[in-house]
Amino acid sequence: MSKRKTKEPKVDVVTLGPSVREGEQVFGVVHIFASFNDTFIHVTDLSGRETLVRITGGMKVKADRDESSPYAAMLAAQDVAQRCKELGITAMHVKLRATGGNKTKTPGPGAQSALRALARSGMKIGRIEDVTPIPTDSTRRKGGRRGRRL
């Protein structure tokens, strides 16, 4: 009988450019997408091409109704901050996004708590930018001619 070949688990090694001097900040970009159904916290390198960490509120809580809650966003942000510290990222630029388009331009309930949790976990915050898509001339909004009747 021949020996069975087993695959060893593949370990990704992420390097963030050249070596960093003492006291120098290594920046990442954290994209926070806060809708009213979930909160996504997605960390990339400065170019935005390489995903380093991506955690959602739904990965942290069991009940579907709690996915967008501030508590779930806080847990997700703490996980993201811990993983970033392992990778050597010490500072972040924040890009905050709501649903936008012809839907609501207001960020969901998890946006503020995610940002606070990142700041409290020891991450330096560089710039905070709102990147909610704003329509210049949009498709027709949902609700019909007479709008949504309450």
UniProtKB/Swiss-Prot annotation:
Keywords: Cytoplasm, Phosphoprotein, Ribonucleoprotein, Ribosomal protein
Organism expressing this protein natively: Arabidopsis thaliana (Mouse-ear cress)
Protein name, UniProt field: Small ribosomal subunit protein uS11z
InterPro entries: Ribosomal_uS11, Ribosomal_uS11_CS, Ribosomal_uS11_sf
Subcellular location: Cytoplasm
Recorded GO MF terms: mRNA binding; structural constituent of ribosome
Quaternary state and interactors: Interacts with AAK6.
Residues recorded with modification Phosphoserine: 19
Family: Belongs to the universal ribosomal protein uS11 family.
This protein's GO CC annotations: cytosolic ribosome; cytosolic small ribosomal subunit; endoplasmic reticulum; plant-type vacuole; plasmodesma
GO BP term, pick one: translation
